């Protein structure tokens, strides 16, 4: 993977983490009894912890392997070269010399 591809992969991951961060509600404030406010804060804290765990998994997820089967096949095709070509035969087979022998009739 080139450095440009790595940077692009990192940008994608950071954009995904940023999107997740935007989806979570802001820190809870507002009216309610002390118990209601406490419960809202606890729920918010649990969601925030889940977001952090998910972001950590996204960020630390290993990069895809650089040598996928397609990449390996392309590399092998690029390395192909004709090393030695045998000399053509000096004598011609009889079937090629005499068109009546070995050839099929058009009615067959």
Curated annotation (Swiss-Prot):
Q: Where is this motif: Nuclear localization signal and RNA-binding (RRE)?
A: 33-49
Q: Where is this motif: Nuclear export signal?
A: 70-82
Extract the InterPro entries matched here.
REV_protein
What are the start and end residues of every segment in region (Disordered)? 83-108
Q: Which GO terms describe its biological process?
A: mRNA transport
Q: Where in the cell is it found?
A: Host nucleus, Host nucleolus; Host cytoplasm
The UniProt keyword set, sorted, is:
Host cytoplasm, Host nucleus, mRNA transport, RNA-binding, Transport
Disulfide bonding pattern of the chain: none
Short name of any one Pfam family annotated for the protein? REV
Q: Name one GO cellular component term.
A: host cell nucleolus
Homomultimerization: region residues: 16-25
* Gene Ontology terms, MF aspect: DNA-binding transcription factor activity; RNA binding
Where along the sequence do coiled-coil regions lie? none
Quaternary structure?
Answer: Homomultimer; when bound to the RRE. Multimeric assembly is essential for activity.
* Comment on protein domains: The RNA-binding motif binds to the RRE, a stem-and-loop structure present in incompletely spliced viral pre-mRNAs. This region also contains the NLS which mediates nuclear localization. These overlapping functions prevent Rev bound to RRE from undesirable return to the nucleus. When Rev binds the RRE, the NLS becomes masked while the NES remains accessible.
Give the protein's function.
Answer: Escorts unspliced or incompletely spliced viral pre-mRNAs (late transcripts) out of the nucleus of infected cells. These pre-mRNAs carry a recognition sequence called Rev responsive element (RRE) located in the env gene, that is not present in fully spliced viral mRNAs (early transcripts). This function is essential since most viral proteins are translated from unspliced or partially spliced pre-mRNAs which cannot exit the nucleus by the pathway used by fully processed cellular mRNAs.
This chain belongs to the protein called Protein Rev
Q: What is the gene name? A: rev
């Amino acid at each position: 993977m080139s450095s440009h591809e790595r940077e692009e992969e990192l940008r994608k991951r950071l954009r995904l983490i940023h999107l997740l961060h935007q989806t979570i509600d802001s820190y809870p404030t507002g009216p309610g009894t002390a118990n209601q406010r406490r419960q809202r804060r606890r729920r918010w804290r649990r969601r925030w912890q889940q977001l952090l765990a998910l972001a950590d998994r996204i960020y630390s997820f290993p990069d895809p392997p650089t040598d996928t089967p397609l990449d390996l096949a392309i590399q092998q095709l690029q390395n192909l070269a004709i090393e030695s070509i045998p000399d053509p035969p000096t004598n011609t087979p009889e079937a090629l010399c005499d068109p009546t022998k070995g050839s099929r009739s058009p009615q067959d």
